[in-house]
Amino acid sequence: MTRTIICRKYKEELPGLERPPYPGAKGQDIFDHVSAKAWGDWLKHQTLLINEKRLNMMNAEDRKYLAGEMDKFFSGEEYAKADGYVPPAQ
């Protein structure tokens, strides 16, 4: 049976993640409050930010920036978008 949670981003009951995506308290918080759908949406957005802003995951400042954007993304705050990116038509 799929575990459901009240998603912090989408404010509705949705299927949760199968396991915490990070170790420690941060991973447990995401596991408890972020749906699998929201996590998948974040991974796509994270990839877009890394590529478009040319972030280097070996650089501590870039990792800190991305972690801050992830918090904003899940909490509903205004988060960074890739400059000039136009999503494909559906």
From Swiss-Prot:
GO biological process: cellular response to oxidative stress
Keywords assigned by UniProt, alphabetized: Iron
Pfam families recorded: Iron_traffic (PF04362)
Matches recorded under InterPro entries: Fe_traffick_prot_YggX, Fe_traffick_prot_YggX_sf
Keyword hit for Iron: yes
Cellular component terms (Gene Ontology): cytosol
Record-level Gene Ontology MF annotations: iron ion binding
Keyword Iron found: yes
SUPFAM superfamilies: YggX-like
Family note: Belongs to the Fe(2+)-trafficking protein family.
Role: Could be a mediator in iron transactions between iron acquisition and iron-requiring processes, such as synthesis and/or repair of Fe-S clusters in biosynthetic enzymes.
Protein name in UniProt: Probable Fe(2+)-trafficking protein
Lineage: Bacteria, Pseudomonadati, Pseudomonadota, Gammaproteobacteria, Pseudomonadales
